[in-house]
Structures are given as structure tokens and as C-alpha cells.
């Protein structure tokens, strides 16, 4: 019996039947048509849906298993990287041992691009690609669920309550242990929801959940058996910086953020097509946990993620601007801004970006960029 059937990604023999099914899904074809041909779809919806269907069928006609669909996705990634980044670099890949599989826990800045960039690095380095944890809050439509599970994503049920939630989390944890034991790499974000303020913190509750799959072991031993490697994704420019600042401003001024059905989709699309500049993916060191305190273990992961964060001029310019208006913390050690040589080109680029944003959002946007510098200084990783 396949007890993971309802949450796991689709397997080789399921790929083609699922593809053939969603290629007939009118709602999906409408979404694809609006993405590729927004203006024409408004005036000629049926014609453009047929055009989208033809385009998709051509792209996936040779897809028959997981590997062939990942090859198609790699082509999309290549184009996205070419269009939205200036550089894509990595560090620490040499630490990954051949024949060993890992649970990668990364900071969370972008809904889909975080795991996509980690996956891209592994794919091109010849490592096994990721099984990706994705929350059911993003899977509002059946065709979206299908698309995610076609691309090696497994489902995290966040909308359940009480006993159902507990059983679901145990199954999820068992699945991740099963993956690592059976030579699959896994990715999960360090927290539920993206870091809107540029502060990357691991949720201790996540670590408790990860340990549930091996109740025969102590918490630290269970986590150690997952071969956990912290990963840091650094974006020179956050494609969703304005959207995040708007959310934080609304929480500050109104007490809460009103999310619509389109909020996540808007963030996903903006994250994919928005300008990112230099993106760096840093693979940390595999962790062996000697403690069973989830708060202490979360701090160990956080320290690696922060230390490996690659700072860009955008981070220092943001801190400089906050300092000029008296908003930067007064207890920052050293005078790191005096020693950072910032290019005129990067200054102009940042100025242009911030001028396009409503002034009421500037403070939140600037802290989103400045906080990695501030936290590195406070933690002694930057002197």
C-alpha cells in the first residue's frame, strides 16, 4: 500500500496520464493564455486558449517520465535566468558527498524561485534533483496541484486542524525520512511564509515536525539522520520587494493584511519574471545535532544561513539611507559603510528602483535590504 500517495509527487507511470488530463483543463488553458497573451486573450479568449493548448502540447509531446518533464522545466529556467538575473553563482556544492542524500533547509525569500534555484544548482552539478515541500495554501486549483506534483513537489497540509493536522504532520515527516533514506534530496523552507523583512529565522516547530518521522530516536538524533544542510539564497534585488513592503505597511497601519485569492499568484508570477540581479546559492555544512532543544537547533541553522548570506551593494545602500534619516540601529558595531566601495552604477540602479515605490513604503523596503547587513554585524559575521 502506498501510504504517501495523496501527498507525494507523481511517479514515472503517472506523468503522461496527468499531463493529458490537465491539457484538457479549460481553467488552466485560460491561465496560460492570459500569461502568454494577456491583451489578445481579453478580446479573443477561445482562440487564445486554443493557441495556448497547441503551444503546451508541442512543448510536452515527448514527456513520458519525471526526468523528461524536468528537462523541459530546465529550459524554462535557463530563459528565466537569462532574462531576470545578471549573475548566478554558488558555493559549497563540493561539500555534498556522492551517494548521500540530504534535506536542504533554506531561507525563504521567494515562493517558487528559492527551491528552483537550489534545484538548478543540483541539476547542473549532476546531483539528484529535489523533492520540494509546498503548502496546500498555494494549491487552490486542482490543475495547480497537478502541475506542482508533476515537478517533484509534495504537499504540506496547513489547512487542517486538531488530530487531522497532527496525523498529517507525522505522515509528512515520515515521507521526508523515507525520501532521504531512499536516495532522494528534499527541500523545505525554514519557516512557513516568506521573510518579508529580510530577517531569516528557522521556526523551531518545523524541527519538531521533522523529527516526528522517527519517534524511536531523540529529536537531535532524528534530525541528524536527515542529513540536514542549511542553504542560503541571496538576491541582489528581491523581485517582490514592493509587494512585501505593502504587506508590512498594511499590517503596521491597519493591524492585519487582507490576502486575496490572487495575492499568492501575483507574488509567484512577480518572483518569476521580476529582476533579481546577482543571485547566489550557498550550500552550508551538514549538521550533526548534539542537543534536543528545538530552539537551540534552530539557532544553529540560522547562524549558518546568516553567515553564508552574500551581501550586495543594494544591502549597504539601504542601510546607508536608513542611517541618514536616523532609522538605523544606534548600537551597530564598526563603521562598515565607510569601508564598502559602492559603484555609481549600482547606486543609480537602486535609486531608480526606490523612486518607483510609494514613499510610505520606503522604510519597510529599505529594512528588507538592510537587515542582512545589520544582523551580520550584530552576530560578528561582518567586521
Specify the residue positions occupied by each region the protein language model found.
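Membrane-interfacial terminal anchoring regions of lipid-handling membrane enzymes
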Residues: 1-102, 108-131, 136-142, 170-186, ...
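Flexible, glycine/proline-enriched loop segments at strand-loop-helix junctions
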Residues: 159-166, 194-200
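Acidic beta-strand-to-loop metal/phosphate-binding motif
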Residues: 189
Amino acid at each position: 500500500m502506498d501510504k504517501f500517495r495523496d501527498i507525494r509527487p507523481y511517479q514515472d507511470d503517472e506523468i503522461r496520464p496527468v499531463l493529458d488530463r490537465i491539457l484538457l483543463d479549460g481553467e488552466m488553458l485560460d491561465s496560460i493564455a492570459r500569461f502568454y497573451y494577456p491583451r489578445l486573450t481579453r478580446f479573443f479568449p477561445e482562440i487564445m486558449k486554443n493557441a495556448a493548448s497547441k503551444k503546451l502540447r508541442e512543448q510536452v509531446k515527448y514527456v513520458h517520465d519525471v526526468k523528461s518533464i524536468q528537462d523541459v522545466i530546465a529550459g524554462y529556467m535557463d530563459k528565466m535566468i537569462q532574462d531576470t538575473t545578471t549573475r548566478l553563482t554558488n558555493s559549497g556544492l563540493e561539500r555534498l558527498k556522492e551517494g548521500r542524500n540530504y534535506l536542504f533547509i533554506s531561507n525563504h525569500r521567494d515562493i517558487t524561485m528559492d527551491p528552483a534555484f537550489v534545484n538548478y544548482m543540483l541539476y547542473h552539478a549532476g546531483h539528484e534533483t529535489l523533492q520540494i515541500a509546498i503548502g496546500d495554501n498555494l494549491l487552490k486549483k486542482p490543475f495547480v496541484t497537478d502541475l506542482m506534483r508533476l515537478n517533484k513537489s509534495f504537499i504540506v497540509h496547513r489547512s487542517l486542524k486538531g488530530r487531522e493536522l497532527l496525523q498529517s504532520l507525522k505522515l509528512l515527516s515520515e515521507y521526508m525520512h523515507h525520501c532521504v533514506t531512499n536516495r532522494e534530496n528534499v527541500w523545505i523552507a525554514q519557516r512557513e511564509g516568506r521573510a518579508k523583512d529580510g530577517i531569516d529565522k528557522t521556526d523551531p516547530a518545523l524541527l519538531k515536525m521533522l523529527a516526528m518521522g522517527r519517534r524511536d530516536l531523540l529529536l537531535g538524533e532524528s534530525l541528524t539522520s536527515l542529513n540536514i544542510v542549511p542553504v542560503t539564497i541571496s538576491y541582489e534585488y528581491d523581485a517582490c520587494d514592493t509587494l512585501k513592503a505593502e504587506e508590512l505597511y498594511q499590517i503596521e497601519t491597519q493591524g492585519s493584511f487582507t490576502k486575496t485569492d490572487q495575492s499568492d499568484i501575483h507574488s509567484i508570477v512577480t518572483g518569476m519574471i521580476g529582476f533579481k540581479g546577482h543571485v547566489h546559492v550557498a550550500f552550508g555544512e551538514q549538521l550533526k545535532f548534539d542537543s534536543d532543544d528545538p530552539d537551540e537547533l534552530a539557532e544553529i541553522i540560522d547562524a549558518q544561513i546568516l553567515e553564508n548570506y552574500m551581501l550586495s551593494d543594494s544591502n549597504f545602500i539601504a542601510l546607508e539611507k536608513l542611517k541618514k534619516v536616523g532609522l538605523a540601529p544606534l548600537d551597530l558595531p564598526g563603521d562598515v559603510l565607510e569601508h564598502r566601495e559602492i559603484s555609481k552604477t549600482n547606486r543609480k540602479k537602486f535609486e531608480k528602483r526606490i523612486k518607483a515605490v510609494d514613499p510610505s513604503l520606503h522604510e519597510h523596503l529599505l529594512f528588507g535590504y538592510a537587515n542582512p547587513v545589520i544582523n551580520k554585524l550584530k552576530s560578528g559575521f561582518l567586521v
